[in-house]
C-alpha cells in the first residue's frame, strides 16, 4: 500500500475516532498498512499510552485490537453501501510480554470480514458473527514476536 493511501486512511481513522470515539483518537493511531486482506495499526508508546512501568497500558493494547479488527469491518461495511450495524460480541486477550515500544496491531482477516458483511446483507434482520484474531508486536524491540494476542467476535446486522 502506498504511503499516500496510508496517510489518507490514517486521516480518516483519526477523524472518525475524534467524532465518534474520542478515546481512540487520544492514543493517536496510525494506519501502517491497509488492504482488502489485512490491516495494521500502530499506536505509539508515549505519555498518553504508557503505564507506571513505562510499557503500554493494557487498556491501550485493547484499544489497538479494537482498532485493527474493527477498522477492517467498518471499511468493508462502507464499501458495501448498506447500513449494517456493527458491534463486538466478545473480547479475549492474552498478554505475553511487556510492550516497551510502539505497538503494531495486525488483523489478517479482511477477506473474511468482506464475506461476513455480505452474509449480513443477504440475511436481513439476522445477526451474523465472525471471530477475528489480532496480534500485537513491537517491531523496534522484539521483531515479529507477539506481545499480545486478541480474539474478538464481530457481530453484524443489516439495519432496516
Regions found by a protein language model. Give the residues of each.
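HotDog/MaoC-like acyl-thioester-processing domains
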Residues: 3-5, 100, 110-160
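Short connector loops at helix/strand junctions that flank enzyme active sites
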Residues: 26, 36, 64, 68, ...
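Catalytic strand-loop segment that frames the active site of acyl-thioester-processing enzymes
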Residues: 26-56
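Residues located in well-ordered beta-strands
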Residues: 30, 92-94, 106-108, 135, ...
Amino acid at each position: 500500500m502506498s504511503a499516500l493511501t496510508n496517510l489518507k486512511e490514517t486521516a480518516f481513522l483519526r477523524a472518525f475516532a475524534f467524532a465518534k470515539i474520542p478515546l481512540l483518537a487520544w492514543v493517536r493511531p496510525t494506519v501502517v498498512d491497509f488492504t482488502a486482506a489485512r490491516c495494521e495499526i500502530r499506536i505509539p508508546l508515549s505519555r498518553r499510552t504508557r503505564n507506571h512501568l513505562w510499557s503500554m497500558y493494557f487498556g491501550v493494547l485493547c484499544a489497538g485490537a479494537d482498532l485493527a479488527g474493527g477498522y477492517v469491518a467498518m471499511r468493508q461495511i462502507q464499501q458495501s453501501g448498506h447500513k449494517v450495524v456493527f458491534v463486538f460480541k466478545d473480547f479475549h486477550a492474552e498478554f505475553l510480554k511487556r510492550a516497551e515500544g510502539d505497538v503494531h496491531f495486525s488483523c489478517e482477516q479482511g477477506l473474511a470480514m468482506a464475506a461476513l458483511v455480505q452474509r449480513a446483507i443477504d440475511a436481513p434482520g439476522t445477526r451474523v458473527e465472525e471471530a477475528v484474531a489480532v496480534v500485537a508486536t513491537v517491531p523496534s524491540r522484539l521483531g515479529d514476536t507477539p506481545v499480545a494476542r486478541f480474539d474478538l467476535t464481530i457481530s453484524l446486522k443489516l439495519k432496516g
